[in-house]
């Protein structure tokens, strides 16, 4: 092995297998772009984003870690959300949950 070398398995990486997902139509009703990161609790995003928030409770974007989705003003797009893993305790963001889901 060479220092710093990666030894990766063959095949694709499967993320979020077996977790609940939901697809939602999201519209940016604001006058500024809004960007949402991969692990942001989607339920607590900027309120200029209009979508079914109850379906987004306990969910985040189903995109690779470190990625984000940008919503331009007036833009509507469908996103796929995936449930948070672990013990389902959420703190921070807009402090709308601050505890167990």
From Swiss-Prot:
It comes from the Bacteria. Its EC number is 3.5.1.5. It catalyses: urea + 2 H2O + H(+) = hydrogencarbonate + 2 NH4(+). GO terms for biological process: urea catabolic process. One of its GO terms (cellular component) is urease complex. InterPro entries: Urease_beta-like (IPR002019), Urease_betasu_sf (IPR036461), Urease_subunit (IPR050069). GO terms for molecular function: urease activity. Its main location: cytoplasm. CDD domains: Urease_beta. The keyword Cytoplasm applies. Keywords: Cytoplasm, Hydrolase. It is found in: Cytoplasm. Pathway: Nitrogen metabolism; urea degradation; CO(2) and NH(3) from urea (urease route): step 1/1. PANTHER family: UREASE. Belongs to the urease beta subunit family. Heterotrimer of UreA (gamma), UreB (beta) and UreC (alpha) subunits. Three heterotrimers associate to form the active enzyme. This is Urease subunit beta.
